[in-house]
């Protein structure tokens, strides 16, 4: 009986040729009758099936892939080397020597830093071996990647004849500032940097302006500038900065800087209009429109109430704190009126008694204006501070503390009222013009959330 584990033919098949011819069909039938699997591979590439004729028992044989002569076949292909072909055959000592002596242009030896990292080096060990600090290593590697992206004709379309501009020692610092932009923006920003001979600090300002321009949509004057022009993006960033300046001279200076770079005619006209208003105010002249009314462009920038930004730990360090009920802007006036009022306070033990239960509370420092209105004060939570009637630069939540006992509208005040089911903040002057004599509450103070002193990405990269 034939065993599947034995690849050799039956002994009877090796005696004589005639006997082999008579027993061969039986041998095939025996082999097929004892197979339970659907197919079995035989030595030499043959196979048999559980059903069908002899032609169905053989599967097509595909030889395994063969490696080139002298090379081991490896199904896994490692990622391509970051080194150019001219540097791939260098040993470790030669690579370190090139970095140590800064041999060649910076973008030629910058890939060696990445290759050393793959070989197990860290920034500290590379600095010890080559003298290149970790910050400079990061700058060289990132700048090299930015430079390579400029060479991509499909995405960047950057003229190759302009690339030698960045071959100088200051080239890595300039290209490093473009790391947050996409390939198209990098090409446009690089052309602008070359045209205006910008230093790294100026390129950083340009890159941040181009990155932030889409997020500033909806702000006053935004539609007059073009997003496709790096100069217009930079001009609008300076135009926007001028509207946040407190001193009128600082405002004029920012607008003059914006006028130096603005490219489109609509953007230039908008900057010139704002610059004329600022210069009139600096000269002490009142700007009057055709109907004889005072221009409120500058006045609209002033809040009219105290606006404070909390510091981290300020509540914990405060001598006294005040607990106030909180309502959302979508809750409406009914919820604001139903918020609890303070009934009794134990100053010694800090126990506060209110007239009803409430779910959301805010703890703020015991500022004087808030303490005076604490009995009837309520906190209105706004999801976006840019909805306030004055100009705010950041999209951030704010807390509006209002006194419900003061509802009469005066032109100098700021008030909370309901419009289309939402709580909004409006100036008293605007409400008086609309004939509104009473509001839901008068704004006492506006609280902005804590913020780091420098909210941008650190200019230095740590090891």
Swiss-Prot record:
Residues 240-294 form a coiled coil. Residues 19-33 have a biased composition (Basic residues). Residues 305-450 are annotated as: C-terminal beta sheet. Residues 1-31 form a transit peptide. Signal peptide: none annotated. Belongs to the RAF family. Has 3 domains, the N-terminal alpha-helical domain, an extended flexible linker and the C-terminal beta-sheet domain. The N-terminal alpha-helical domain stabilizes RbcL dimers and RbcL dimer-dimer interactions, facilitating RbcL(8) formation. The C-terminal beta-sheet domain probably dimerizes Raf1. The 2 C-terminal beta-sheet domains are swapped and pack against each other to form the dimer interface. PANTHER family: RUBISCO ACCUMULATION FACTOR 1 (PTHR35299), RUBISCO ACCUMULATION FACTOR 1.2, CHLOROPLASTIC (PTHR35299:SF3). This is Rubisco accumulation factor 1, chloroplastic. It comes from Zea mays (Maize). The lineage of its organism: Eukaryota, Viridiplantae, Streptophyta, Embryophyta, Tracheophyta. The gene is RAF1.
């Amino acid at each position: 009986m034939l065993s599947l584990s034995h690849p050799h033919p039956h002994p009877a098949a090796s005696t004589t040729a005639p006997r082999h011819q008579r027993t061969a069909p039986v041998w095939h039938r025996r082999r097929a009758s004892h197979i339970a699997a659907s197919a079995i591979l035989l030595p030499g590439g043959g196979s048999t099936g559980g059903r069908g004729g002899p032609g169905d028992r053989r599967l097509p044989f595909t030889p395994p892939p063969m490696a080139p002569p002298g090379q081991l076949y490896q199904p896994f292909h490692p990622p391509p080397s970051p080194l150019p072909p001219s540097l791939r055959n260098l040993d470790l000592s030669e690579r370190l020597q090139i970095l140590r002596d800064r041999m060649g242009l910076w973008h030629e030896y910058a890939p060696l830093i990445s290759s050393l990292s793959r070989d197990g080096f860290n920034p500290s060990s590379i600095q010890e071996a080559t003298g290149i600090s970790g910050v400079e290593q990061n700058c060289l590697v990132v700048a090299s990647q930015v430079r390579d992206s400029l060479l991509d004709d499909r995405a960047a379309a950057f003229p190759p004849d302009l690339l030698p501009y960045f071959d100088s020692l200051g080239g890595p610092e300039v290209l490093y500032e473009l790391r947050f932009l996409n390939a198209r923006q990098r090409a446009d920003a690089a052309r602008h940097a070359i045209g205006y001979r910008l230093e790294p600090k100026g390129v950083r300002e340009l890159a941040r302006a181009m990155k932030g321009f889409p997020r500033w949509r909806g702000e006053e004057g935004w539609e007059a500038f073009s997003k496709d022009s790096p100069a217009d993006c930079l001009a609008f960033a300076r135009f926007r900065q001028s509207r946040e300046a407190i001193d009128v001279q600082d405002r004029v200076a920012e607008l003059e800087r914006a006028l130096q770079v603005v490219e489109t005619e609509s953007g230039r006209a908008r900057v010139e209009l704002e610059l004329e208003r600022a210069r009139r105010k600096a000269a002490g002249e009142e700007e009057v429109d055709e109907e004889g009314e005072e221009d409120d462009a500058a006045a609209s920038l002033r809040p009219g109430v105290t606006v404070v930004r909390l510091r981290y730990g300020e509540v914990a360090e405060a001598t006294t704190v005040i607990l106030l009920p909180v309502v959302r802007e979508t809750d409406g006036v009914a919820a604001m009126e139903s918020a609890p009022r303070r009934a009794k306070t134990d100053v010694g033990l800090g126990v506060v008694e209110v007239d009803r239960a409430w779910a959301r509370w805010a703890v703020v420092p015991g500022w004087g204006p808030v303490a005076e209105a604490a009995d009837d004060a309520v906190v209105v939570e706004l999801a976006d501070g840019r909805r306030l009637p004055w100009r705010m630069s950041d999209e951030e939540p704010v807390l509006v503390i209002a006194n419900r006992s003061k509802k009469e509208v005066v032109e100098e005040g700021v008030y909370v009222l309901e419009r289309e089911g939402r709580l909004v903040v409006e100036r008293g002057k605007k409400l008086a013009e609309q004939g509104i004599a009473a509001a839901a509450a008068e704004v006492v103070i506006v609280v902005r959330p804590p913020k780091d002193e420098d909210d941008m990405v650190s200019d230095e990269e740590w090891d």
